[in-house]
Amino acid sequence: MRLCDRDIEQHLEEGKIVIEPRPDSSRISGVSVDVLLGNEFRVFQAHTAPYIDLSGPKEEVSAAIDRVMSDEIYIKDSEVFILHPGELALAVTHESVTLPDNIVGWLDGRSSLARLGLMVHVTAHRIDPGWSGRIVLEFYNGGRLPLALRPGMVIGALNFETMSGSAARPYNKRTNAKYKSQQGAVASRIDQD
C-alpha cells in the first residue's frame, strides 16, 4: 500500500523512514516527498572508448567504464550544471535516505521538467528495502535546448510502499550490494555483477 502524506510524516517522526536533512512539511504532498538536487555530478567523456562490451571480461568492462566516466564534479550551490541535448549525466540527491526492510521507495521525475526533456532516472527508479544512502540520478536531456541544473532545486519526488512483509534479503544485508551507503554520484559497477 502506498503511503499518504500523513503516513510519510508519521514514518519520518518515528524514524521508520529517515531522510537527512529532514524535509519540512511543505515538501511532503499527497503521496510523495520532494527531493533536491545535490552538488555531485559525473559525465561521460567523449571518444575515450569505442564501446563498452557489457558481457565482456570484468576487467575489460571496468577499464572501459573508468575511461569513459569523469571524476566526480562538484558544483557549488551558486553555480549551474549544463546538460546538453542528447547527453547523459549522473548526479545525486541532496538528501540521504534510509528505508526499513518492509518499505520500498520509488523515485519519480517532475512533470514540469519532463516537459522540457529532462529525465531524472533512465530506468532505475526503485529504492530497495534496506537502502541507506543518497540516490543517484541518471539524467538524460531528450529536449532540444541545454538545461541549467542548480544544486538545491526540486528535482524529483519519492513515494513509498509498504510490502506484504519484511524482505528476507534487504539491500543493507546483501553481501553483493554494489552501491551500499553511496554518498556521491557513483559510476556504474556493472563489472561487479
Curated annotation (Swiss-Prot):
Stretches that traverse the bilayer: none
Pfam families (UniProt xref): DCD
Active site: 138 (proton donor/acceptor)
Record-listed dCTP binding positions: 110-115, 128, 136-138, 171, 178, 182
E.C. number: 3.5.4.13
Family the entry assigns: Belongs to the dCTP deaminase family.
Role description: Catalyzes the deamination of dCTP to dUTP.
NCBIfam families associated with the record: dCTP_deam
HAMAP family cross-referenced by the UniProt entry: dCTP_deaminase
Protein name per the record: dCTP deaminase
Organism: Tolumonas auensis (strain DSM 9187 / NBRC 110442 / TA 4)
